[in-house]
Design a protein with these regions (language model features):
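Conserved sequence/active-site signature of Rossmann-fold short-chain dehydrogenase/reductase
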Residues: 22-23, 78-80, 142
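Conserved Rossmann-fold NAD(P)-dependent oxidoreductase catalytic core, especially the SDR/UDP-sugar
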Residues: 1-47
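Active-site Tyr-X1-5-Lys
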Residues: 43-71
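NAD(P)-dependent short-chain dehydrogenase/reductase
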Residues: 60-109, 114
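A short C-terminal helix-loop "cap" of Rossmann-like NAD(P)-dependent dehydrogenase/epimerase domains
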Residues: 35-39, 91-104, 155-160
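Mid/C-terminal beta-alpha module of Rossmann-like enzyme folds, strongest
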Residues: 108, 120-169, 173, 207-212
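Amphipathic terminal alpha-helices
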Residues: 187-213
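Conserved catalytic Lys-bearing alpha helix of Rossmann-like short-chain dehydrogenase/reductases
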Residues: 2, 11, 51-59, 114
Length: 213
């Protein structure tokens, strides 16, 4: 068990990160004025969610027993350039629109830039005030159809974006992370990312996966 080994090794701090997706049932009190925060109970609706939730429980057990300091980070969909370029978030959409293909899009995405995630890690490491706390890392929410149109506009594509709007999703709070000092740049960072992926795609290419369309 990794946590037990960390205790034996006298590790001073553990930072546990997991996807912020598995809350299961959402309380009816959650709305735009009262977004889902870190205190919301977790009732996983899948085995995967149950496992992730149980790991958080183990982490808190070791923290409460004073084995080590603990901080938990829960990012939503993280976007950023990956070493394997075509695995970068939204690469396929950018690539297809860059070659003026039409794309069909549906659904929606809660997003956070990898820069913000790294910043959060830096803010909690060695920070005693963050010990025992959980932080949601979310910058915003965008419909994939709107994202496609933003991509087309940013790279001057002649390709058209078709499809249906996704659901608005559950409002989530990032107040705790902001109070920690994490910055969330919003859609302007997405535009910068789109331009960077477009530039890198032109220089290095990437593997197209037509089955996804």
């Amino acid at each position: 068990d990794l946590l037990e080994e960390a205790k034996k090794a006298k590790v001073k701090q553990v930072v546990f990160m997991r996807a912020c997706t598995e809350f299961g049932e959402i309380l009816p009190s959650v709305d735009q004025e009262h977004p889902l925060d870190e205190n919301h109970p977790i009732w996983p609706s899948s085995l995967y969610g149950s496992i992730k939730s149980s790991i958080e429980g183990f982490c808190h057990y070791y923290y409460k027993s004073r084995a080590f300091d603990l901080a938990i980070l829960r990012p939503v969909t993280v976007y950023g350039v990956r070493p394997q370029l075509d695995k970068s978030e939204w690469f396929q959409t950018i690539d297809y629109l860059a070659t003026n293909y039409n794309v069909d899009l549906k659904g929606s995405t809660k997003y956070v830039a990898v820069d913000s995630v790294v910043q959060a890690i830096q803010k909690v490491i060695g920070n005693s005030e963050a010990s025992g706390k959980t932080y949601h890392l979310i910058d915003g929410h965008i419909h994939n159809l709107d994202l496609g149109k933003l991509i087309a506009e940013t790279i001057d594509s002649f390709g058209e974006c078709e499809g249906v709007m996704g659901e608005d999703g559950v409002p989530m709070s990032n107040k705790a992370a902001k109070d920690l000092g994490v910055e969330f740049p919003g859609q302007k960072r997405i535009v910068e990312y789109i331009k960077l992926i477009h530039k890198l795609q032109g220089e290095y290419g990437g593997e197209r996966n037509i089955q996804n369309w």
